[in-house]
Swiss-Prot record:
Name listed for the protein in its UniProt record: Cysteine--tRNA ligase
Organism superkingdom: Bacteria
Enzyme Commission number(s) of this protein: 6.1.1.16
Motif range ('KMSKS' region): 263-267
GO cellular component: cytosol
Cofactor: Zn(2+)
Cofactor binding annotation: Binds 1 zinc ion per subunit.
Any one GO molecular-function label of the UniProt entry: zinc ion binding
Keywords linked to the UniProt accession: Aminoacyl-tRNA synthetase, ATP-binding, Cytoplasm, Ligase, Metal-binding, Nucleotide-binding, Protein biosynthesis, Zinc
Oligomeric and partner information: Monomer.
Organism of this sequence: Malacoplasma penetrans (strain HF-2)
Gene name of this polypeptide: cysS
Length: 439
C-alpha cells in the first residue's frame, strides 16, 4: 500500500519491510477541553490505523500527551491550582473523548512529556554535542543555520521563515529562526537539569519521544496542517542533528476545519468544543462527517453539512437493517465461516481516499437492493456481512444491534401472518417493525 508524502510529493510504500509500521501523531496540550478541529486528525489516523491492522501490518502507534507548557502554567495560575492537577484533569477529559469517538487504542501508547524529562535532557545533550545547539543564560537554542535541510518539511527557505515563538527572547538568539530546546525558568513546573532550572521546549518533546519509542526514523508522521511549520519542521531538523536522517519517511497533514467558511477562533465566537458537539450529535454522525472530504483538504463545518452526514449514514444503516430482516425471515442470515473480503478496501488502499469509500458503500447499498429484489439471498448475506464489517471495524462506526429476541419474534410473526394471508394482523406487525426501523 502506498500513501502520498507531502514533503516529497510522491506516493510511498507505508512499510519498507511489508510487515511493520511505526506511526506518530502529535497529541494535545492538555490545558483545556479539545475543540472539534482536534477531532479530525485523530479520527483520520484512527481509520488509517484500523486499515493497516486489517491488512496484517504490525502497527506501533504513538500519540503523545503534552502536559508541560506555558499555556498549562498560565491556566493553572488563573484557576489557582497546580499544573499537574490541571493537566491531569484535561488529560482524563481527552481520554473520555477518545473513548466516546471510538478510537481503537489497543496498539497505541500515550507517553506524557512529564514522565520523560531525563530522556529529553539526554536528547538535547546529543544535539549540543553534535554542535547544532548553543546555550545562552540557561536557555538551549537550536541553531537553524547549521543545516541546509531546515525548511524541507514546510518547503521554505531559511531567509523566508518566520521568527520563533513570541514567548522566546529573540535578543538572546543567534538567528531569529532558532528555537528553544530548553527554557530557563523558575515560574511554574520546572526541573533542575545540567543546563538550568527550567522546562523543555515543545518541539523537542515530540522528536525525543519518537526516538525513544519508535527509533531514529518512523514510517508515518501525522498531524494537522497547522503543525507543518514550525512544529514538524523543528522536529525533523532535530532528528537530522541527532541521527543524520529525516524523522519520517511519510508526512501526512490533515486539512483545516472551518466553521461556516471561517477559521475557528474565540474572537469570532465560533469556537466549538468536542464535548459540546458530542452532547448534541452522536459519534457515528461526527465520524461520518469527517469522511466526506479528502483528509488533506479543508473541511467546512456547518449544521447543514453535519445533518446531511447524519441522514446519509442513518439511511445506510437503515437499509442494512432491512436487508438483515429479510435474510432472517428467509432463514438465510448466517455470518459463520464468512471472512471479510479485503477487495472492499480498494478505495482506502488507493491513497487513503475517504470520500471514495463513502461513495463505494452507497453504491453497494443500491446493489444490495437489487439482490433483495432478485431474491439472491446468498450474495446479499455476504455483502451485508462485508458492508457491516467495513463500517464498524474499519470506519469505526458504532454498531447498535436492533435484532434482539423480541425483534426476531416480531419478524417471524409478521412473515407467518403474511404467508397465511392474514393481512390485517400482519399490517399491525409491519407497523411495529417499521417503528423499530427494521422494515
Amino acid at each position: 500500500m502506498k500513501i502520498y508524502d507531502f514533503v516529497s510529493k510522491t506516493d510511498k510504500e507505508v512499510s519498507l519491510d511489508k510487515k511493520n509500521i511505526k506511526m506518530y501523531v502529535c497529541g494535545p496540550t492538555v490545558y483545556n477541553h479539545v475543540h472539534i478541529g482536534n477531532l479530525r486528525p485523530i479520527i483520520t489516523f484512527d481509520v488509517l490505523n484500523r486499515l493497516f491492522l486489517e491488512l496484517g501490518y504490525n502497527v506501533t502507534f504513538i500519540h503523545n500527551i503534552t502536559d508541560i507548557d506555558d499555556k498549562i502554567v498560565n491556566k493553572a495560575k488563573e484557576e489557582n491550582i497546580g499544573e499537574l492537577e490541571l493537566s491531569s484533569y484535561y488529560e482524563t477529559q481527552y481520554f473520555d473523548i477518545l473513548k466516546t469517538i471510538n478510537i481503537h487504542t489497543s496498539n497505541m501508547k500515550f507517553p506524557r512529556v512529564s514522565d520523560h524529562i531525563k530522556d529529553i535532557e539526554n536528547y538535547i545533550q546529543k544535539i549540543v554535542n553534535n554542535k547544532f545547539a548553543y546555550l545562552v543564560d540557561g536557555d538551549v537554542y537550536f541553531d537553524t543555520t547549521k543545516s541546509n535541510q531546515y525548511g524541507k518539511i514546510s518547503n521554505k527557505k531559511l531567509d523566508e521563515l518566520l521568527v520563533g515563538d513570541k514567548s522566546e527572547d529573540n535578543l538572546k538568539k543567534n538567528n531569529p529562526q532558532d528555537f528553544a530546546l530548553w527554557k530557563q525558568t523558575t515560574i511554574g513546573l520546572n526541573w533542575d537539569l545540567k543546563f538550568s532550572t527550567g522546562r523543555p521546549g515543545w518541539h523537542t518533546e515530540c522528536s525525543c519521544l519518537i526516538n525513544k519509542y519508535l527509533g531514529d526514523q518512523i514510517d508515518i508522521h501525522g498531524g494537522g496542517i497547522d503543525l507543518k511549520f514550525p512544529h514538524h519542521e523543528n522536529e525533523n531538523i532535530q532528528n537530522i542533528a541527532v541521527n543524520n536522517k529525516d524523522l519520517a519517511r511519510i508526512w501526512m497533514h490533515v486539512g483545516h476545519l472551518n466553521i461556516n467558511n471561517q477559521k475557528m477562533s474565540k474572537s469570532l465566537s465560533n469556537f466549538i468544543l468536542a464535548k459540546d458537539l458530542l452532547s448534541e450529535y452522536n459519534t457515528n454522525t461526527v465520524r461520518w462527517f469527517f469522511y466526506q472530504t479528502s483528509y488533506s483538504n479543508p473541511l467546512n463545518f456547518t449544521t447543514e453539512n453535519l445533518i446531511n452526514s447524519k441522514n446519509q449514514l442513518e439511511n445506510i444503516i437503515y437499509n442494512l437493517n432491512i436487508f438483515k430482516s429479510h435474510l432472517i425471515i428467509e432463514q438465510k442470515y448466517n455470518e459463520k465461516n464468512l471472512e471479510f473480503d479485503k477487495s472492499n478496501l480498494i478505495e482506502l488502499t488507493n491513497n487513503f481516499n475517504l470520500p471514495n469509500i463513502v461513495s463505494f458503500i452507497e453504491e453497494k447499498i443500491k446493489y444490495s437492493s437489487i439482490l433483495l429484489r432478485n431474491k439472491n439471498f446468498e450474495e446479499l448475506n455476504k455483502l451485508h456481512f462485508n458492508l457491516s464489517y467495513l463500517l464498524t471495524k474499519i470506519l469505526g462506526i458504532i454498531h447498535v444491534n436492533l435484532f434482539d429476541d423480541e425483534a426476531i419474534e416480531l419478524l417471524n410473526k409478521w412473515n407467518k401472518l403474511k404467508q397465511e394471508k392474514n393481512f390485517s394482523e400482519s399490517d399491525k406487525y409491519r407497523k411495529l417493525l417499521m417503528e423499530k426501523k427494521l422494515l
